[in-house]
Regions:
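N-terminal leader/linker segments that initiate helical-solenoid repeat arrays
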Residues: 1-80, 91, 100, 388-398
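TPR-repeat structural position
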Residues: 20, 54, 61, 95, ...
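Canonical tetratricopeptide repeat
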Residues: 43, 84, 117-118, 150, ...
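Structural motif corresponding to the intra-repeat A-B loop/turn of tetratricopeptide repeats
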Residues: 51, 55-58, 92, 125, ...
Length: 398
Protein backbone atom coordinates (compact mmCIF):
# COMPACT_ATOMS: atom_id res chain seq x y z
CA UNK A 1 0.00 0.00 0.00
CA UNK A 2 1.34 3.46 -0.93
CA UNK A 3 1.00 6.20 1.72
CA UNK A 4 -0.14 9.69 0.72
CA UNK A 5 3.28 11.26 1.34
CA UNK A 6 5.06 8.66 -0.79
CA UNK A 7 2.39 8.83 -3.49
CA UNK A 8 2.95 12.55 -3.84
CA UNK A 9 6.54 11.83 -4.90
CA UNK A 10 5.73 9.07 -7.37
CA UNK A 11 5.19 9.62 -11.08
CA UNK A 12 1.89 8.86 -12.77
CA UNK A 13 3.46 5.77 -14.31
CA UNK A 14 4.70 4.51 -10.93
CA UNK A 15 1.32 5.12 -9.31
CA UNK A 16 -0.48 3.19 -12.04
CA UNK A 17 2.05 0.39 -11.88
CA UNK A 18 1.57 0.15 -8.10
CA UNK A 19 -2.22 0.14 -8.41
CA UNK A 20 -2.02 -2.58 -11.03
CA UNK A 21 0.30 -4.69 -8.88
CA UNK A 22 -2.09 -4.29 -5.94
CA UNK A 23 -5.06 -5.35 -8.08
CA UNK A 24 -3.18 -8.42 -9.29
CA UNK A 25 -2.15 -9.42 -5.76
CA UNK A 26 -5.74 -9.03 -4.49
CA UNK A 27 -7.18 -11.08 -7.35
CA UNK A 28 -4.57 -13.81 -6.97
CA UNK A 29 -5.29 -14.07 -3.23
CA UNK A 30 -9.02 -14.24 -3.86
CA UNK A 31 -8.63 -16.90 -6.54
CA UNK A 32 -6.66 -19.09 -4.18
CA UNK A 33 -9.86 -19.25 -2.12
CA UNK A 34 -12.26 -19.55 -5.08
CA UNK A 35 -10.35 -20.84 -8.12
CA UNK A 36 -13.52 -21.45 -10.15
CA UNK A 37 -14.60 -17.80 -10.21
CA UNK A 38 -14.66 -17.00 -13.94
CA UNK A 39 -15.20 -13.26 -13.46
CA UNK A 40 -12.16 -12.88 -11.21
CA UNK A 41 -10.02 -15.11 -13.42
CA UNK A 42 -10.90 -12.94 -16.41
CA UNK A 43 -10.20 -9.74 -14.49
CA UNK A 44 -6.83 -11.16 -13.43
CA UNK A 45 -5.92 -11.93 -17.04
CA UNK A 46 -6.82 -8.39 -18.09
CA UNK A 47 -4.89 -6.79 -15.24
CA UNK A 48 -1.85 -8.91 -16.03
CA UNK A 49 -2.07 -7.82 -19.66
CA UNK A 50 -2.39 -4.20 -18.57
CA UNK A 51 0.75 -4.52 -16.43
CA UNK A 52 2.64 -6.10 -19.33
CA UNK A 53 1.70 -3.28 -21.70
CA UNK A 54 2.91 -0.77 -19.10
CA UNK A 55 6.27 -2.41 -18.51
CA UNK A 56 6.82 -4.22 -21.85
CA UNK A 57 8.47 -6.93 -19.75
CA UNK A 58 8.83 -10.30 -21.48
CA UNK A 59 8.25 -12.03 -18.14
CA UNK A 60 5.02 -10.11 -17.61
CA UNK A 61 3.77 -11.05 -21.08
CA UNK A 62 4.64 -14.69 -20.44
CA UNK A 63 2.72 -14.62 -17.16
CA UNK A 64 -0.26 -13.10 -18.95
CA UNK A 65 -0.20 -15.74 -21.66
CA UNK A 66 -0.02 -18.54 -19.09
CA UNK A 67 -3.06 -17.23 -17.20
CA UNK A 68 -5.10 -16.73 -20.39
CA UNK A 69 -4.30 -20.25 -21.62
CA UNK A 70 -5.12 -21.78 -18.24
CA UNK A 71 -8.40 -19.87 -18.02
CA UNK A 72 -9.51 -20.97 -21.51
CA UNK A 73 -8.58 -24.54 -20.63
CA UNK A 74 -10.57 -24.33 -17.39
CA UNK A 75 -13.63 -22.38 -18.50
CA UNK A 76 -13.71 -22.86 -22.26
CA UNK A 77 -13.46 -20.24 -25.02
CA UNK A 78 -15.26 -17.37 -23.32
CA UNK A 79 -15.49 -14.25 -25.47
CA UNK A 80 -13.56 -11.89 -23.22
CA UNK A 81 -10.72 -14.37 -22.79
CA UNK A 82 -10.51 -15.08 -26.53
CA UNK A 83 -10.55 -11.34 -27.27
CA UNK A 84 -7.67 -10.78 -24.86
CA UNK A 85 -5.73 -13.67 -26.37
CA UNK A 86 -6.24 -12.14 -29.83
CA UNK A 87 -4.86 -8.82 -28.60
CA UNK A 88 -1.83 -10.55 -27.11
CA UNK A 89 -1.16 -12.61 -30.23
CA UNK A 90 -1.50 -9.54 -32.45
CA UNK A 91 1.01 -7.64 -30.34
CA UNK A 92 3.53 -10.44 -30.89
CA UNK A 93 2.87 -10.71 -34.65
CA UNK A 94 1.22 -14.13 -34.32
CA UNK A 95 -1.30 -13.10 -36.93
CA UNK A 96 -2.56 -16.55 -37.92
CA UNK A 97 -3.34 -17.18 -34.26
CA UNK A 98 -5.43 -13.99 -34.08
CA UNK A 99 -7.99 -15.44 -36.50
CA UNK A 100 -8.12 -18.67 -34.53
CA UNK A 101 -8.56 -16.79 -31.25
CA UNK A 102 -11.51 -14.81 -32.55
CA UNK A 103 -13.15 -17.84 -34.13
CA UNK A 104 -13.01 -19.90 -30.93
CA UNK A 105 -16.06 -17.99 -29.68
CA UNK A 106 -18.68 -18.07 -32.49
CA UNK A 107 -20.16 -14.61 -31.89
CA UNK A 108 -16.89 -12.86 -31.10
CA UNK A 109 -15.85 -11.82 -34.65
CA UNK A 110 -18.97 -9.65 -34.85
CA UNK A 111 -18.18 -7.73 -31.68
CA UNK A 112 -17.08 -4.12 -32.06
CA UNK A 113 -13.70 -4.68 -30.38
CA UNK A 114 -12.98 -7.77 -32.48
CA UNK A 115 -13.77 -5.91 -35.69
CA UNK A 116 -11.15 -3.31 -34.72
CA UNK A 117 -8.57 -6.08 -34.35
CA UNK A 118 -9.58 -7.56 -37.71
CA UNK A 119 -9.08 -4.14 -39.33
CA UNK A 120 -5.61 -3.93 -37.77
CA UNK A 121 -4.96 -7.41 -39.11
CA UNK A 122 -6.03 -6.35 -42.61
CA UNK A 123 -3.57 -3.44 -42.49
CA UNK A 124 -0.72 -5.68 -41.35
CA UNK A 125 -1.50 -8.13 -44.14
CA UNK A 126 -1.48 -5.48 -46.85
CA UNK A 127 -5.25 -5.15 -47.31
CA UNK A 128 -5.14 -1.39 -46.90
CA UNK A 129 -8.49 -0.42 -48.40
CA UNK A 130 -10.29 -3.01 -46.28
CA UNK A 131 -8.57 -1.69 -43.17
CA UNK A 132 -9.44 1.94 -43.92
CA UNK A 133 -13.07 1.19 -44.79
CA UNK A 134 -13.51 -0.88 -41.63
CA UNK A 135 -12.05 1.88 -39.45
CA UNK A 136 -14.39 4.39 -41.08
CA UNK A 137 -17.40 2.10 -40.59
CA UNK A 138 -16.55 1.52 -36.93
CA UNK A 139 -16.21 5.27 -36.35
CA UNK A 140 -19.61 5.85 -37.95
CA UNK A 141 -21.10 3.35 -35.50
CA UNK A 142 -19.29 4.61 -32.40
CA UNK A 143 -16.79 7.46 -32.42
CA UNK A 144 -14.26 5.92 -30.02
CA UNK A 145 -10.87 7.53 -29.51
CA UNK A 146 -8.95 4.35 -30.28
CA UNK A 147 -10.52 3.83 -33.70
CA UNK A 148 -9.98 7.49 -34.57
CA UNK A 149 -6.33 6.91 -33.66
CA UNK A 150 -6.24 3.79 -35.82
CA UNK A 151 -7.53 5.74 -38.81
CA UNK A 152 -5.04 8.52 -38.05
CA UNK A 153 -2.20 5.99 -38.07
CA UNK A 154 -3.40 4.69 -41.45
CA UNK A 155 -3.40 8.15 -43.03
CA UNK A 156 -0.04 9.00 -41.47
CA UNK A 157 1.52 5.93 -43.05
CA UNK A 158 -0.06 6.85 -46.39
CA UNK A 159 1.46 10.32 -46.24
CA UNK A 160 -1.50 12.52 -45.33
CA UNK A 161 0.06 14.01 -42.21
CA UNK A 162 -2.47 16.84 -41.93
CA UNK A 163 -5.46 14.50 -41.90
CA UNK A 164 -3.68 12.16 -39.51
CA UNK A 165 -3.04 14.98 -37.04
CA UNK A 166 -6.65 16.19 -37.26
CA UNK A 167 -7.89 12.68 -36.52
CA UNK A 168 -5.55 12.39 -33.55
CA UNK A 169 -6.89 15.73 -32.30
CA UNK A 170 -10.44 14.37 -32.63
CA UNK A 171 -9.36 11.28 -30.70
CA UNK A 172 -8.13 13.52 -27.88
CA UNK A 173 -11.52 15.24 -27.80
CA UNK A 174 -13.19 11.89 -27.08
CA UNK A 175 -11.07 11.27 -23.98
CA UNK A 176 -12.06 12.19 -20.45
CA UNK A 177 -9.93 13.73 -17.71
CA UNK A 178 -9.56 10.24 -16.20
CA UNK A 179 -7.83 8.90 -19.31
CA UNK A 180 -4.57 10.82 -19.13
CA UNK A 181 -2.36 7.91 -20.17
CA UNK A 182 -4.42 7.53 -23.33
CA UNK A 183 -4.26 11.29 -23.91
CA UNK A 184 -0.49 11.24 -23.50
CA UNK A 185 -0.23 8.35 -25.96
CA UNK A 186 -2.19 10.28 -28.59
CA UNK A 187 -0.01 13.35 -28.00
CA UNK A 188 2.98 11.07 -28.48
CA UNK A 189 1.62 9.95 -31.87
CA UNK A 190 1.18 13.56 -32.92
CA UNK A 191 4.81 14.12 -32.00
CA UNK A 192 5.80 11.10 -34.10
CA UNK A 193 4.09 12.75 -37.08
CA UNK A 194 6.12 15.91 -36.44
CA UNK A 195 9.33 13.89 -36.24
CA UNK A 196 8.56 12.21 -39.56
CA UNK A 197 8.39 15.67 -41.13
CA UNK A 198 11.59 16.96 -39.54
CA UNK A 199 9.67 19.32 -37.25
CA UNK A 200 11.75 18.48 -34.22
CA UNK A 201 10.78 21.40 -31.98
CA UNK A 202 7.09 20.71 -32.60
CA UNK A 203 7.70 17.06 -31.79
CA UNK A 204 9.52 17.97 -28.58
CA UNK A 205 6.58 20.18 -27.57
CA UNK A 206 4.17 17.29 -28.11
CA UNK A 207 6.36 14.96 -26.10
CA UNK A 208 6.57 17.48 -23.26
CA UNK A 209 2.78 17.78 -23.23
CA UNK A 210 2.53 14.00 -23.13
CA UNK A 211 4.95 13.86 -20.21
CA UNK A 212 3.03 16.54 -18.32
CA UNK A 213 -0.22 14.65 -18.84
CA UNK A 214 1.24 11.34 -17.66
CA UNK A 215 4.61 11.62 -15.96
CA UNK A 216 7.36 9.05 -15.69
CA UNK A 217 6.39 6.93 -18.68
CA UNK A 218 9.48 5.37 -20.26
CA UNK A 219 7.84 5.34 -23.71
CA UNK A 220 7.50 9.12 -23.71
CA UNK A 221 11.05 9.57 -22.45
CA UNK A 222 12.40 7.30 -25.18
CA UNK A 223 10.77 9.55 -27.79
CA UNK A 224 12.12 12.66 -26.05
CA UNK A 225 15.59 11.12 -26.37
CA UNK A 226 15.09 10.69 -30.12
CA UNK A 227 13.99 14.33 -30.46
CA UNK A 228 17.08 15.46 -28.55
CA UNK A 229 19.33 13.42 -30.83
CA UNK A 230 17.61 14.71 -33.97
CA UNK A 231 18.24 18.24 -32.72
CA UNK A 232 21.95 17.49 -32.27
CA UNK A 233 21.90 17.17 -28.47
CA UNK A 234 23.64 13.83 -28.64
CA UNK A 235 25.11 13.45 -25.16
CA UNK A 236 21.87 14.51 -23.50
CA UNK A 237 19.99 12.02 -25.68
CA UNK A 238 22.42 9.20 -24.90
CA UNK A 239 22.11 9.83 -21.16
CA UNK A 240 18.32 9.69 -21.39
CA UNK A 241 18.42 6.49 -23.45
CA UNK A 242 20.69 4.89 -20.83
CA UNK A 243 18.27 5.91 -18.10
CA UNK A 244 15.28 4.47 -19.97
CA UNK A 245 17.15 1.23 -20.69
CA UNK A 246 18.06 0.87 -17.01
CA UNK A 247 14.33 0.73 -16.27
CA UNK A 248 13.07 -0.96 -19.44
CA UNK A 249 15.87 -3.00 -21.02
CA UNK A 250 14.23 -3.55 -24.40
CA UNK A 251 16.70 -4.70 -27.07
CA UNK A 252 15.37 -2.25 -29.66
CA UNK A 253 16.30 0.59 -27.30
CA UNK A 254 19.76 -0.91 -26.84
CA UNK A 255 20.18 -1.03 -30.63
CA UNK A 256 19.01 2.57 -30.91
CA UNK A 257 21.56 3.71 -28.33
CA UNK A 258 24.27 1.85 -30.23
CA UNK A 259 23.22 3.55 -33.46
CA UNK A 260 23.32 6.92 -31.73
CA UNK A 261 26.89 6.28 -30.59
CA UNK A 262 27.86 5.36 -34.17
CA UNK A 263 26.19 8.56 -35.38
CA UNK A 264 28.28 10.45 -32.80
CA UNK A 265 31.47 8.81 -34.09
CA UNK A 266 31.88 6.67 -30.96
CA UNK A 267 31.72 3.16 -32.45
CA UNK A 268 33.57 1.66 -29.50
CA UNK A 269 30.78 2.77 -27.18
CA UNK A 270 28.20 1.32 -29.55
CA UNK A 271 29.37 -2.28 -29.78
CA UNK A 272 28.39 -3.50 -26.27
CA UNK A 273 24.87 -2.19 -26.84
CA UNK A 274 24.67 -3.88 -30.23
CA UNK A 275 25.79 -7.17 -28.72
CA UNK A 276 23.17 -6.98 -25.98
CA UNK A 277 20.44 -6.18 -28.50
CA UNK A 278 21.41 -8.96 -30.89
CA UNK A 279 21.64 -11.52 -28.10
CA UNK A 280 18.12 -10.66 -26.94
CA UNK A 281 16.73 -10.75 -30.49
CA UNK A 282 18.25 -14.15 -31.19
CA UNK A 283 17.21 -15.59 -27.82
CA UNK A 284 13.64 -14.52 -28.57
CA UNK A 285 13.72 -16.16 -32.00
CA UNK A 286 15.16 -19.38 -30.52
CA UNK A 287 12.19 -19.53 -28.14
CA UNK A 288 9.90 -19.50 -31.17
CA UNK A 289 8.88 -15.85 -30.91
CA UNK A 290 8.48 -13.97 -34.19
CA UNK A 291 8.01 -10.34 -33.19
CA UNK A 292 11.71 -9.48 -33.49
CA UNK A 293 12.11 -10.73 -37.07
CA UNK A 294 11.73 -7.17 -38.36
CA UNK A 295 14.33 -5.90 -35.90
CA UNK A 296 16.73 -8.68 -36.88
CA UNK A 297 16.29 -7.70 -40.52
CA UNK A 298 17.08 -4.09 -39.69
CA UNK A 299 20.00 -5.04 -37.45
CA UNK A 300 21.75 -7.19 -40.02
CA UNK A 301 21.01 -4.78 -42.88
CA UNK A 302 22.14 -1.56 -41.22
CA UNK A 303 24.25 -2.41 -38.16
CA UNK A 304 26.19 -5.39 -39.48
CA UNK A 305 25.50 -4.72 -43.18
CA UNK A 306 25.16 -8.47 -43.68
CA UNK A 307 22.68 -8.59 -46.54
CA UNK A 308 22.39 -12.38 -46.67
CA UNK A 309 21.42 -12.66 -43.00
CA UNK A 310 19.10 -9.65 -43.29
CA UNK A 311 17.33 -11.19 -46.29
CA UNK A 312 16.83 -14.47 -44.42
CA UNK A 313 15.07 -12.74 -41.53
CA UNK A 314 13.16 -10.46 -43.89
CA UNK A 315 11.69 -13.41 -45.78
CA UNK A 316 10.59 -15.02 -42.53
CA UNK A 317 8.90 -11.79 -41.46
CA UNK A 318 7.25 -11.36 -44.85
CA UNK A 319 5.77 -14.87 -44.63
CA UNK A 320 3.94 -13.75 -41.50
CA UNK A 321 2.68 -10.40 -42.78
CA UNK A 322 3.23 -9.05 -46.26
CA UNK A 323 2.83 -5.29 -46.29
CA UNK A 324 4.78 -2.28 -47.52
CA UNK A 325 7.00 -2.35 -44.44
CA UNK A 326 8.07 -5.99 -44.80
CA UNK A 327 8.36 -5.63 -48.59
CA UNK A 328 10.63 -2.60 -48.22
CA UNK A 329 12.67 -4.37 -45.54
CA UNK A 330 13.30 -7.31 -47.87
CA UNK A 331 14.15 -4.90 -50.70
CA UNK A 332 16.74 -3.17 -48.51
CA UNK A 333 18.21 -6.46 -47.34
CA UNK A 334 18.56 -7.65 -50.94
CA UNK A 335 20.17 -4.32 -51.83
CA UNK A 336 22.70 -4.85 -49.04
CA UNK A 337 23.35 -8.31 -50.48
CA UNK A 338 23.98 -6.95 -53.97
CA UNK A 339 20.82 -8.48 -55.46
CA UNK A 340 19.74 -5.30 -57.21
CA UNK A 341 17.11 -6.66 -59.62
CA UNK A 342 15.28 -8.53 -56.87
CA UNK A 343 15.64 -5.52 -54.59
CA UNK A 344 14.07 -3.28 -57.21
CA UNK A 345 11.15 -5.68 -57.63
CA UNK A 346 10.34 -5.75 -53.93
CA UNK A 347 10.75 -2.01 -53.54
CA UNK A 348 8.32 -1.49 -56.43
CA UNK A 349 5.78 -3.63 -54.58
CA UNK A 350 6.24 -1.58 -51.42
CA UNK A 351 5.85 1.71 -53.29
CA UNK A 352 2.69 0.48 -55.05
CA UNK A 353 0.94 0.44 -51.66
CA UNK A 354 0.77 4.23 -51.65
CA UNK A 355 2.80 4.47 -48.45
CA UNK A 356 4.74 7.72 -48.18
CA UNK A 357 7.69 8.01 -45.82
CA UNK A 358 11.06 9.73 -46.06
CA UNK A 359 12.99 6.60 -45.11
CA UNK A 360 11.09 4.51 -47.67
CA UNK A 361 11.82 7.04 -50.41
CA UNK A 362 15.48 7.39 -49.42
CA UNK A 363 15.93 3.63 -49.64
CA UNK A 364 14.08 3.58 -52.96
CA UNK A 365 16.45 6.26 -54.26
CA UNK A 366 19.50 4.17 -53.34
CA UNK A 367 18.05 1.06 -54.99
CA UNK A 368 17.05 2.86 -58.19
CA UNK A 369 20.50 4.44 -58.37
CA UNK A 370 22.15 1.03 -58.05
CA UNK A 371 19.86 -0.22 -60.83
CA UNK A 372 21.12 2.55 -63.11
CA UNK A 373 17.89 4.55 -63.01
CA UNK A 374 19.33 7.88 -61.92
CA UNK A 375 16.30 10.01 -62.81
CA UNK A 376 14.02 7.83 -60.68
CA UNK A 377 16.60 7.92 -57.91
CA UNK A 378 16.60 11.72 -57.94
CA UNK A 379 12.81 11.78 -57.96
CA UNK A 380 12.63 9.68 -54.83
CA UNK A 381 15.30 11.76 -53.11
CA UNK A 382 13.14 14.78 -53.86
CA UNK A 383 10.08 13.08 -52.41
CA UNK A 384 12.01 12.15 -49.27
CA UNK A 385 13.19 15.74 -48.83
CA UNK A 386 9.67 17.06 -49.41
CA UNK A 387 8.42 15.01 -46.47
CA UNK A 388 11.42 15.59 -44.21
CA UNK A 389 14.08 18.08 -45.34
CA UNK A 390 16.23 17.01 -42.37
CA UNK A 391 16.13 13.30 -43.05
CA UNK A 392 19.89 13.00 -42.60
CA UNK A 393 19.54 13.87 -38.91
CA UNK A 394 19.49 11.06 -36.38
CA UNK A 395 16.23 9.13 -36.41
CA UNK A 396 14.91 5.82 -35.13
CA UNK A 397 13.79 3.05 -37.48
CA UNK A 398 10.25 2.31 -36.28
Amino acid sequence: MVTASIAAKLTDFELERNRTDDDIATLEASLRQSPTDLEKQTRLAYRLYHRATLTESAAHYQATQAVISAAISQFGPKEDLCLLKANLDFRFHRLAAVHRDLEMAPKLPGRFEARSILADLAFQQGRYREARETYEKLIEEDRTWDNLARLAHYHGKMGDMGLADRLYAEAEDELTAKEMRSFSWVELQRGVLNMAQGRYEDAADRYRRADMAYSGYWLIQEHIAEALAAAGKFHEAAALYRDVISRTPKPELQQTLGELYVFMGEAGQAEPWFERALSAYLDSAKRGDVHYYHHLTDFYADVRQDGAAAAEWARMDLELRENFSTQAALAWALFRNGEIDASLDWMSRALSSGAADAELFQQAAAIYKAAGQSSESQRFLGRAAAINPHYGNFHVHR
